[in-house]
Regions:
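Bacterial N-terminal signal peptides that target proteins for export
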Residues: 2-12
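N-terminal signal peptide c-region/cleavage motif recognized by signal peptidases
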Residues: 20-22
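N-terminal alpha-helical modules
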Residues: 24-199
Length: 199
């Protein structure tokens, strides 16, 4: 009797787990389709992949850092999560009730998560992966000394006054400065460069 009860509990658990998986996760992404439904399915699956990679890199970063830096990384990561959720919700609400609202939210989630993934890798290697410094140097041209600061500001775009982003960026750039001597002001501009274009 106990074995039969355990069997039914197991079956019920499997069905419960299957019902909790979103419908789009069970459907195949069709990259050739531009219907909203397919864009949402593909966007969700892309976000899930990038988010899984980010979680893996976060764990690796925690292992590679000294105890004091681990505490700051945890704090910065929490600030980043609050920023990402608030920022992408704002983008969603800006389009809602339009059919593109979920697509805009997923695009924001993918872009901000991918940018954070690059930051976590950079914290482990000391090498920013966003191409910011290379692009700024190329834009500066021959007169690198004079043109570098100007090209960095142009690449970073307009000031971004979101308080959640500022808390996240300040914490991250403070950490990057301590670990790799990245200039705080340049780091802030570099992080603005990573923000989605529709900010």
């Amino acid at each position: 009797m106990i074995k039969l009860k355990t069997f039914f509990e197991l079956i019920a658990g499997v069905f419960l787990a299957a019902s909790l998986v979103p419908a789009h996760a069970q459907e195949a992404c069709n990259p050739d389709s531009f219907t909203n439904r397919d864009l949402i399915i593909c966007g969700q699956q892309t976000f899930e992949k990038v988010d899984a990679m980010l979680n893996e890199q976060y764990k690796k970063a925690l292992v590679s850092l000294a105890p004091a830096e681990k505490m700051q990384l945890k704090d910065v990561q929490k600030k980043w999560v609050r920023f990402k959720e608030g920022f992408c919700e704002e983008i969603y609400q800006g389009t809602f009730p339009g059919a593109e609202a979920p697509i805009d939210r997923l695009g924001c989630l993918v872009q901000t998560t991918n940018a954070r993934l690059g930051e976590l890798i950079a914290l482990q290697t000391g090498l920013p992966l966003d191409g910011f410094y290379k692009a700024a140097t190329a834009m500066a041209g021959q007169d690198r000394e004079k043109g570098l600061a100007t090209s960095m500001e142009r690449l970073g775009g307009a000031a971004f006054d979101d308080p959640l982003w500022k808390q996240y960026a300040d914490g991250h750039c403070e950490m990057a400065g301590r670990l790799f001597r990245e200039d705080f002001a340049y780091c802030i501009v570099r992080m603005r460069f990573q923000l989605p274009m529709n900010r």
